[in-house]
Amino acid sequence: MAKEKFARTKVHMNVGTIGHVDHGKTTLSAAITSYCAKKFGDKQLKYDEIDNAPEEKARGITINTRHLEYQSDRRHYAHIDCPGHADYVKNMITGAAQMDGGILVVSAPDGVMPQTKEHLLLARQVGVPSIIVFLNKVDLVDDPELLELVEEEVRDALAGYGFSRETPIVKGSAFKALQDGASPEDAACIEELLAAMDSYFEDPVRDDARPFLLSIEDVYTISGRGTVVTGRIECGVISLNEEVEIVGIKPTKKTVVTGIEMFNKLLDQGIAGDNVGLLLRGVDKKEVERGQVLSKPGSIKPHTKFEAQIYVLSKEEGGRHSPFFQGYRPQFYFRTTDITGTISLPEGVDMVKPGDNTKIIGELIHPIAMDKGLKLAIREGGRTIASGQVTEILL
């Protein structure tokens, strides 16, 4: 059956659910697609289709970020269901790097939990512009005063990570809204959430003037057709049969884009902000991997050594409890890459303490596509310890 063409009739926006494990992110994602399927005829995804990997089903948790789509009155949304499980924050980082707005899910009976804060911190670091809160499982809280306390706690957490205290907080039960035959009262919270997203999230400004760049998130083989890479177009425009380079980690390789898809619909061109799958000519799956980029030939080069300005998180912000020294070897996160590197400190600086702002020189074990201004996070032992951006390319 021939695939249908993707029609750009509404503003396209990338959003996602973040929050602590078991607070109801995936249930809410399923409830939204269910509501929009009824209202607009979109495809509905059931909970167990979103938690789609065998390990996720067995453990009942989301590990890999999952992309969904639905539409509201104003927009076409691409929705990322982000994992809440601590081991999988790496995927949260790459998922959040694609968000134009975030939906923070907080369970009313539990309130703000450690991962709620970690996800807010990550959202701030990777540049999610604004957050809406869905206060879930409110049917399990009988005391209105307790709900008010949780709401206040959520607003404090938002303000603590640089988001607005006036953020809309939508209250409801995603589980009740998801049930077949949910009453209009039970489904009202989803309608309210979509209306809040349409009005509170600003239309994203797309960077389509700069040369094309897509950060590779996943690689697939489609039998009989070839290798497909998926990811979000960071900037620029890509058209069918255009030449691109695969840059970073391995030697740079040229190829041609022979197919462009978004949510199983065909595109003639992909533009900045689109989550797409690109079919590459003559590329074996082994030759390309997550963390590389596809780019306009000659527009970006791979580098291993750079200068960066970083802020080191304090203990209170979830960072290290002690300083680090010359030769420190953490994990550097750039776009969808995480890679080991060594830190050299400026002359006359012996150590860097939590809470410090400092210049560093980073040297990576593999080259990655890099230019001035690229944002980075530094992580160690499962937590973010610093964030910043590249100020100079050295090698």
UniProtKB/Swiss-Prot annotation:
Signal peptide range in chain numbering: none
GO molecular-function term, one example from the UniProt record: GTPase activity
Catalytic activity field: GTP + H2O = GDP + phosphate + H(+)
Gene Ontology cellular-component annotations: cytosol
Chain positions covered by the region annotation G1: 19-26
Binding residues for GTP: 19-26, 81-85, 136-139
Role summary: GTP hydrolase that promotes the GTP-dependent binding of aminoacyl-tRNA to the A-site of ribosomes during protein biosynthesis.
PANTHER family hit by this protein: ELONGATION FACTOR TU, MITOCHONDRIAL, ELONGATION FACTOR TU-RELATED
Protein name: Elongation factor Tu
Organism of derivation: Treponema pallidum (strain Nichols)
